[in-house]
Amino acid sequence: MKPASIASIKSQLTNGELTQKQIEELYKDSRKGVQAILKRHEKQQEKQALLKQAFIKMNTYEKEAYRNGNHYIAGVDEVGRGPLAGPVVAAAVILPKDFQLLGINDSKKLSEVQRNEFSHYIKQHAIAYQISFIDNTIIDKINIYEASKQAMKEAISGLQPYPDHALIDAVPLEGLNCTYEAIIKGDAESVHIAAASVLAKVARDDWMKELHEKYPLYGFNSNMGYGTKEHLQAIETYGVTPYHRYSFAPLHKYRHNTLLN
């Protein structure tokens, strides 16, 4: 019998159509192309195994919350504390108990393509999610820490159903109608918080890209409002916009200046 083509073997391995016994038989195939495919397959399997282990570890807080009798668990995170322009954005998300998304992590550790793909998947599979924007004028009035907390609280309040328990990235939130845990570096420790991190990051980035269309001189589509060299130079050259945060140190001197409209 003529052996299967290398292309056919590659397709079958990729689609998971071969049994373990059939894969073991392929190691006897002397063709270099087949052995190269098997090597790549091994590496992919090892990578998948590591991703599964990481995902299981990131479910530790969730498992404990479920054991304590909670049904709806929310992950909560915010992005945009550091930028000189734009809002701070928080997301809260309730995921089903059997939710799985290998590779989920702190949004800062993901590529833009991954974040966009993950955000779409999370929205499709979430029981509920809510995203809250607190603009720069509020940030300047109450400070960035309080604005971050307000964004988180608004995101949680908008969830339907309301959560029984919240897993929050680092920030303690008083006044919630549910129990909660504030977890240091929670976006790398909890699947729910990581999912909220992704939703918030994608939402804020999209908002800043839209702002770039109105103010293209500041590079908001790439710096997302952060104080890059190019952004600071643009401020020196053109002044500030109505979306800059005067309460942040580099912009104090512009507080009473005429804004660029």
Curated annotation (Swiss-Prot):
GO terms for molecular function: manganese ion binding; RNA binding; RNA-DNA hybrid ribonuclease activity. It is found in: Cytoplasm. InterPro entries: RNase_HII, RNase_HII/HIII, RNase_HII/HIII_dom, RNaseH-like_sf, RNaseH_sf. A divalent metal cation binds at D77, E78, D169. Manganese or magnesium. Binds 1 divalent metal ion per monomer in the absence of substrate. May bind a second metal ion after substrate binding. Its cofactor is Mn(2+); Mg(2+). The keyword Transmembrane helix does not apply. Keywords: Cytoplasm, Endonuclease, Hydrolase, Manganese, Metal-binding, Nuclease. Disulfide bonds: none annotated. Belongs to the RNase HII family. PANTHER family: RIBONUCLEASE H2 SUBUNIT A, RIBONUCLEASE HII. This is Ribonuclease HII. It comes from Oceanobacillus iheyensis (strain DSM 14371 / CIP 107618 / JCM 11309 / KCTC 3954 / HTE831).
